[in-house]
Amino acid sequence: MARSEPRPLSGKVVAITGAARGIGLATARACAARGMKVAIGDLDLGEAQRAAESVPGAVALALDVTDRQSFEAYLDAAEAQLGPVDVLVNNAGIMQLGPFVDEDEATAIRQVDINVHGVLHGMKLVLPRFKARGAGHLVNIASMAGKTGIPGGATYSGTKFFVYGVSEAVRGELLDTAIEVSCVMPVPVNTELAAGLQRGRGSTFVEPEDVAAEIVSVLEHPRFDVPVPRSIGRLVQVTGVLPRGAREAIGRAFKADKVLAGADSNARRAYELRAAHSEPGLEPGKQAKQLSDGSSD
């Protein structure tokens, strides 16, 4: 069957969370290169503004995904400056590693707040806008750790299982509409989030630009499952039919069970500290007001 013509992206508005760096920034650049209008959202407004300088026509907006009021203000500000949002990329997320039994409650809660509640806020706020206009595309960034539980990152892995599951369920609810839902599942990406990870025999890492390219591809040719790289998706499908013992033996043979569990804590220290202390700099109400009226003091 011939592949359908790509959907035009030029002039479309895309809102990207956690877009000041990493996958988010690479996606912002890739979308802008297709003529899309980009709203860069990030908790660190200064970094977002610096990022926007490298993305033609982009606007930088403060965003705390854990705060529904802040998220709504972000979408309102994006639409006020660029027009109705056609695409939301729920990219913001953190990964803090270590043995599950040693993980403190604050670390677990922080990951759930950002990786789960942040995605839920975005979905619940943008989908009514899409439904009112009769179209839209929701892209949620999960992980291959959301398809296969990875030791050393149990809470992170659990949050990404949630992202995949809620995305799949909501897609089912929207099948009779023109609203698209996609779930992107990369292997470890060469960003600060992957600092210190073990690179075992057969392990695969990708670049932020690889993920961004797949996101643009899925906007042009909508589909739900978006593994990055695509080959890993086929591998997971094949190994998924094997008995659990066989799957685990293969994982140990390729040291997949050490990718997160064997991470170098010293190499990860700077990232882990930033992730642990990435608290919003403004009270939610004040932040929302500033986002709405464009003020910054």
Model-assigned labels for residue ranges:
Residues 6-38:
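Canonical Rossmann dinucleotide-binding motif of NAD(H)/NADP(H)-dependent dehydrogenases/reductases
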Residues 45, 63-73, 105:
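The beta1-alpha1 cofactor-binding region of Rossmann-like NAD(H)/NADP(H)-dependent oxidoreductases
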Residues 99-100, 104-112:
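Substrate-binding pocket helix/loop in short-chain dehydrogenase/reductase
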Residues 101, 150-155:
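Active-site loop immediately N-terminal to the catalytic Tyr-X3-Lys motif
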Residues 123, 159:
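Active-site helix of classical SDR
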Residues 143:
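Residue(s) in the substrate-gating loop at a strand-loop-helix junction
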Residues 183, 199-236:
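C-terminal helical subdomain
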